[in-house]
Amino acid sequence: IWTKQKQETIEKIPPETEKIIAEAENSNVYNNSELDTIAHKEIKVENTQVEENNERLEIVENNNDIDPQETKEWLESLSAVVYSEGPERAHFLIKQLIDQAYKEGSNIPYTQNTPYINTIPADEEIKSPGDQNIERKIRALIRWNSAVMVVRANMRDPSLGGHIGTFASAATLYDIGMNHFWRAKSNKFGGDLIYFQGHSAPGIYARAFLEGRLDEKQLDRFRQEVYPGGLSSYPHPWLMPNFWQFPTVSMGLGPMLAIYQARYMKYLINRGLIKDEGRKVWAFLGDGEMDEPESLGAIGLAAREKLDNLIFVVNCNLQRLDGPVRGNGKIIQELEGSFRGAGWNVIKVIWGSYWDPLLANDKTGHLVKAMNETVDGEYQAMKARDGAYVREKFFGKFPETRELVSSLSDKDIWRLNRGGHDPHKVFAAYDRATKNIGSPTVVIAKTIKGYGMGKTGESVNTTHQTKKLDIDDLMYYRDR
């Protein structure tokens, strides 16, 4: 039961891991060309950048626009500046216009929010160099072992608890870091520091099992530290000093501790006590966790101290312990405003690669308008239903968006993925975060709570409390 095979047990981890990798290399589990399958029929990306920019700037109907033609001319002028002179020049001109407006007595409303789309455009992404067949296979095994560990523990004692849905939503976020960005301590390098989100601990144990660092007996003692070799419920170096680096529970401790750890490292570097090796401090957080006073309490200090060695990754699966995080609001936009206002570099990872052709063909702006206007409760409901529901409730908001997906089947629409589950989108965000200079960075990734759990747990309010899966749900989770 510890692997994706039916009721089989891995006895020798390293050889089995080698076998898994070999199988993945020869399989067609995941093909890079798969990302292009939705870009078919009427969906095509324009070849000419100037024409594309101009066509994208057609005005969405606005009853407050007394002169749409004038608005169109202004937008086309801005597009021409961006294309011919670059975004820096465009930013300068916009700032000059805003300053002049204030001088003229115009009180322009201020916002720290950008549209509800990815911060990094598709054509600027750095693609992951990894073998997606192997990485996806390994990710599936880790998700499976993480879930089964909790299920097996609660079959013995229902009071043990544990969390399946959190790591299921965050697996890709951790996987990309583990495979491509985090550097271990050695004799020549101090190592990066990672604050793991507390409720995702089962997934970290599951990966350690696949790597041969933990055995099956230890996984069978999850949340049973009283037994020799038992695993602690959450990251805790006092209980497991040879495994965990930092404690991150209760919720809210991780982000504040990470800020002061990054600050202390800068302190030591600035005084010549340690070398500047480009080490990073990563903190993985939940969107519900960000409501804890400690979570946002010191973000101003991080910006003032210019802690560019600090990276937050907020897993926005839209759900907390007892329900939605912001049912009638948008937690990603709220967090963006808080962090940008404090002076952080913000990278939003909202939409996966399957959305790219649709966004490229959103000539009227109605798709982005629908994205901006849809609240988190609606997004959560969509991922608990099916493609037909998404077509009607989301794309059906405007005739233009309905037409945009007219060539897609309900199955195609259901495959439109969220950014936090797309390895290429996550890789691009991490790559940019590690290269940022002069400020801390927060990566805000949109995911699905209980990803892969099917009707029992995917995007439903009870996901966080789900400790058991019946045989049908286990088979679905295994085969997905």
Positions of the model-derived regions?
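Hydrophobic alpha-helical scaffolding
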Residues: 64-68, 83, 87, 128, ...
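Long, well-ordered, tryptophan-enriched scaffold segments
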Residues: 316-480
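Short acidic (Asp/Glu) and glycine-rich catalytic loops that position anionic groups and cofactors
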Residues: 73, 151-154, 181-185, 238, ...
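Cofactor-binding active-site loop characterized by glycine-rich and histidine/acidic residues
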Residues: 130-142, 146-156, 163-305, 328-329
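Generic beta-sheet signal
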Residues: 192, 279-281, 310, 439-447
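Short internal beta-strands
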Residues: 194-197, 309-317
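N-terminal amphipathic, basic-rich helices that act as targeting or association modules
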Residues: 35, 40, 45-211, 475-478
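Acidic, low-complexity intrinsically disordered tails
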Residues: 2-61
